[in-house]
């Protein structure tokens, strides 16, 4: 009778240690199944520095002639499910996990195998890749959060900061133990770093991005990148010309659970998706933000988040209608209705002068998904159907406030030499931003 063995791992930069462990696992039986962790699952459990894509790691394992089957591991409960699904006789794992998987003895026999000393993916990454050096542009709340979260991503290092006020810059660098600080942007960009994170006033984004790209820096910038279509097109054209990465800081797009949600929806479980509804409200005034910030309005400040969810699921919009409420010359709320392919509808509600439950619903012909508030910090989502017994829930780890997943994506893309994220493509960024552009054009007309 065939004896089935299963094991799991990331297998980043496949090395002799991996090979030895896999061969030891195969020696325990006849049929070896290898589970390769998805990039999103790795990030959900704090593994933020994986250098190879999921596809590259799977391909490396598939080339091994002694491996009989390769599967993708996407969530923490999958191991127990796989033991039953594949009729596994032995679950094999490295002895650095001794005791961690004893609970699986309920389903199969667990075998802890000796690992090869002196070799690891971490060591290989340190040898092959240099740490991404980054400069921060802006000293506001976002900058402080970014600096804290970047400490959890091992392949990036903040080494410089720019601000308009030199006294504030010097105070910030001293408190944060950052080597370089400057109040002259052009001089700042001459410093030896690879990339910038921009969190300045919205009206300064375009100029700060353009100047950074011209200085051959990769750019991660708070949203929106620009309020005009021509400006945005110009920035992406410049990034392409300079062969530099330009990415908008929509952190939801890089959260493990958010990406798993999109993959689940692509399987067609809900049937044809007819409507996506999402809300995002934030009372900036009550939180003590300056008027110069929140007077940009709810649409410019918040709409890109609901638009992200709608665009990722329904694609590019065909028509857009705005229903805003304005006070003191800016919109305190806006209900935005978009139409899409096959008559699907997107409903986005944003507000800075009203409070609303920040949840999201994705409605299909066979069922719906409910994402509880705050949906943009996606941790949990529920699939629900007419038959309530068929309902199920996904729960993912979500560490910090989500910035570390975005930072990990940004730094990994730079190290790989990739100029576009598959989690948030250039076309998607332009489609999302286009809704804001249309609103501002309508206000001016």
Describe the residue ranges of each PLM region.
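Rossmann-fold dehydrogenase core element
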Residues: 234-251, 272-276
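Contiguous beta-strand/loop segments that form the cofactor/metal-binding neighborhood of enzyme cores
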Residues: 301-302, 307-378, 408-416
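Nucleotidyltransferase catalytic core that binds NTPs
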Residues: 1-131
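C-terminal helix-rich "cap/oligomerization" subdomain common to oxidoreductases
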Residues: 187, 195-198, 341, 409-445
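N-terminal Rossmann-like dinucleotide-binding module
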Residues: 130-176, 445
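Predominantly a Rossmann-like dinucleotide-binding segment in NAD(P)-dependent oxidoreductases
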Residues: 252-321
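Beta-loop-alpha module in the N-terminal Rossmann-like domain of NAD(P)-dependent dehydrogenases
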Residues: 176-236
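N-terminal Rossmann-fold NAD(P) dinucleotide-binding loop
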Residues: 18, 143-146, 205
